[in-house]
């Protein structure tokens, strides 16, 4: 996917001050309910969940359900499983078309974290803000829908329905469903000591989109202008937008090639939160230790300048449509990282070895002084495409 021209509201006969991100008070997957609260809310659902003999069932047909990002439900016939996920987010960028693509990629990401590369069907969930004027609604929402549809087509699937409602905030999401044979998905519970942790997108998207909005807010911009330039912010924002819109499908396919043992995608709970959740699911007594944090260029400095506001260095900063965190055999990890960069998969794919799996008690942690890997923007080398339907 090529880089796009910056969204210009006036090209769509909108006021130049129009910002999609103003139609929600939370950003992206920053809408997540805190993990501890979520677990308590789900307790009543889990009480009577899967009363069958789990050991027998697991040996015959793997199953995942409440508390996980994706459900894997054995079907009654044919040795197949239903694999399904749902997700929604709030606007995190101001380009409606790209926001649609990001929303779709975010929904699909939970399938990809299971190593599933084919999606049979998608539904779109759309909340149209009642604060949008008729003109804004009629110009902006079709762009969002088109972006969602285009991303679904890139993923080899289609949108066949959904639900659209009025809402105070713009809400974007969907449901992704597929039917799989057991060899088409990878259960996220087989990490072993000696594995390494690989991450397939840099961190810092939430920081990049936040500071991009600060360009219009002098009192906030003044806090960080000594550590970052306007050009740095613009590049980080564009890079974040392209990363969020990029599907994790290539990484999902390579999980099979290089014998991945477990994976999750990095979204609203941050790198550490999702690593902890994945560690809890492991069959073996292991723990994850993260040594390296790949971060969008200059965003680590911005985060430090803001104190603990973002939580980036502590692993708690939310990501939207982030990369996959994959447990790979040590001897396979470097080959995975090299292969994902191959031009045959298109531009923009990267991966980093960020930590290890060791014997432990199913926890995850970041070392006291992790190495920050500054990830330079790649967009300068890519073509720029205009927004669909814009008038010159």
Swiss-Prot record:
Active site: 31
Molecular functions (GO terms): ATP binding; metal ion binding; protein heterodimerization activity; protein homodimerization activity; selenide, water dikinase activity
Identification of the protein by name: Selenide, water dikinase 1
Binding site for ATP: 32, 67-69, 87, 110, 161-164
Amino acids binding Mg(2+): 69, 110, 265
Reaction catalysis annotation: hydrogenselenide + ATP + H2O = selenophosphate + AMP + phosphate + 2 H(+)
Keyword annotations: ATP-binding, Cell membrane, Kinase, Magnesium, Membrane, Metal-binding, Nucleotide-binding, Nucleus, Selenium, Transferase
Major location (coarse): membrane
NCBIfam families referenced in this protein's UniProt entry, alphabetically: selD
Positions of the record's site feature: Important for catalytic activity: 32
Lineage, uppermost ranks: Eukaryota, Metazoa, Chordata, Craniata, Vertebrata
The keyword Mitochondrion belongs to this UniProt entry's keyword annotation: no
Family matches, as PANTHER family: SELENIDE, WATER DIKINASE, SELENIDE, WATER DIKINASE 1
Protein EC: 2.7.9.3
Family membership: Belongs to the selenophosphate synthase 1 family. Class II subfamily.
Transmembrane segments: none
